[in-house]
Amino acid sequence: MTTRRIVTSEKSTLDYDGKGAPEPSNTSPAVPSSVIWKLMSFTFAMITLPIGTYFFTVNWVFQGNATYAGGLAALMANVVLIAYVIMAFRDDQEEMREEAEKSKKKL
């Protein structure tokens, strides 16, 4: 039979920290908060605007005709989506202009 040797002075590989001292972590978000705010706003609009349009028009504008109310609600969903895409393109163009100005200043 073999016996296990117990030595308290030996260190295993788990006892060594190979990385050294920890560096401060960068916890800032990768996406600017303005972009997140716009996304959340358009998400809220995408949920509430078509549903609100449907119920408003089915009860007061079209007097119970759900077909026209549903069509108008679908149109409003597309309006919100197109508005978000246009705003995203504008934000991207602004970022590209800022980067171009920074590169011109470096030269």
Swiss-Prot record:
<keyword id="KW-0472">Membrane</keyword>
<dbReference type="GO" id="GO:0005789">
    <property type="term" value="C:endoplasmic reticulum membrane"/>
</dbReference>
<keyword id="KW-0256">Endoplasmic reticulum</keyword>
<feature type="short sequence motif" description="Prevents secretion from ER">
    <location>
        <begin position="104"/>
        <end position="107"/>
    </location>
</feature>
<dbReference type="GO" id="GO:0033116">
    <property type="term" value="C:endoplasmic reticulum-Golgi intermediate compartment membrane"/>
</dbReference>
<feature type="topological domain" description="Cytoplasmic">
    <location>
        <begin position="90"/>
        <end position="107"/>
    </location>
</feature>
<keyword id="KW-0812">Transmembrane</keyword>
<feature type="transmembrane region" description="Helical">
    <location>
        <begin position="42"/>
        <end position="62"/>
    </location>
</feature>
<keyword id="KW-0968">Cytoplasmic vesicle</keyword>
<protein>
    <recommendedName>
        <fullName>Vacuolar ATPase assembly integral membrane protein vma21</fullName>
    </recommendedName>
</protein>
<dbReference type="InterPro" id="IPR019013">
    <property type="entry name" value="Vma21"/>
</dbReference>
<dbReference type="GO" id="GO:0070072">
    <property type="term" value="P:vacuolar proton-transporting V-type ATPase complex assembly"/>
</dbReference>
<feature type="region of interest" description="Disordered">
    <location>
        <begin position="1"/>
        <end position="30"/>
    </location>
</feature>
<feature type="compositionally biased region" description="Polar residues">
    <location>
        <begin position="1"/>
        <end position="11"/>
    </location>
</feature>
<keyword id="KW-1133">Transmembrane helix</keyword>
<comment type="function">
    <text>Required for the assembly of the V0 complex of the vacuolar ATPase (V-ATPase) in the endoplasmic reticulum.</text>
</comment>
<dbReference type="Pfam" id="PF09446">
    <property type="entry name" value="VMA21"/>
</dbReference>
<dbReference type="GO" id="GO:0012507">
    <property type="term" value="C:ER to Golgi transport vesicle membrane"/>
</dbReference>
<comment type="similarity">
    <text>Belongs to the VMA21 family.</text>
</comment>
<feature type="topological domain" description="Cytoplasmic">
    <location>
        <begin position="1"/>
        <end position="41"/>
    </location>
</feature>
<feature type="topological domain" description="Lumenal">
    <location>
        <begin position="63"/>
        <end position="68"/>
    </location>
</feature>
<feature type="transmembrane region" description="Helical">
    <location>
        <begin position="69"/>
        <end position="89"/>
    </location>
</feature>
